[in-house]
């Protein structure tokens, strides 16, 4: 999935959570079949932690794959 598609999908997942351009670039490494699950995981983690912007540091800190 390309960066622009990821950016659109990620930033429409929740109106209160924004994904940075760098975070969306990092998400290009996620296989297409797992993209919705990855975005939903990050949105839920952001909500749980009171975060409104998902950046690369947040992705790394909350990566369920370690």
Functional labels for PLM-detected ranges:
Residues 1-66:
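Non-catalytic accessory segments flanking P-loop/AAA+ NTPase cores
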